[in-house]
């Protein structure tokens, strides 16, 4: 099981979130990005910017990301063994044109 560092745990307790957690390999990130780009091509940029809520029900790659063993290990280290995926949501920050 991957463990969080004490500084990360402290940040999570104080701020309620963490960022910059290194979970996925470059190849995994590339694969997820390709799948997201295909989803964006189907649904449109506006929908993908804020409207991808609970897409893990329809999109296997979102489910795979949300249930990644490395992610679950990290979350269990922070929150305990019993976890449940309540929802997924993409927040896409596109460049201003």
Regions found by a protein language model. Give the residues of each.
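Non-heme Fe(II)-dependent double-stranded beta-helix
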Residues: 1-15, 19-97
């Amino acid at each position: 099981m991957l463990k969080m560092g004490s500084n990360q745990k402290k940040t999570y307790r104080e701020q309620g979130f963490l960022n910059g957690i290194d979970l996925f390999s470059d190849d995994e990130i590339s694969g997820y990005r390709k799948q997201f780009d295909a989803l964006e091509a189907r649904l449109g940029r506006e929908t993908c910017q804020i409207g991808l809520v609970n897409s893990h029900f329809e999109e296997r790659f979102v489910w795979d990301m949300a249930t990644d063993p490395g992610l679950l290990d990290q979350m269990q280290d922070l929150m305990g063994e019993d976890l449940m995926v309540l929802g997924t949501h993409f927040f896409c920050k596109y460049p201003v044109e």
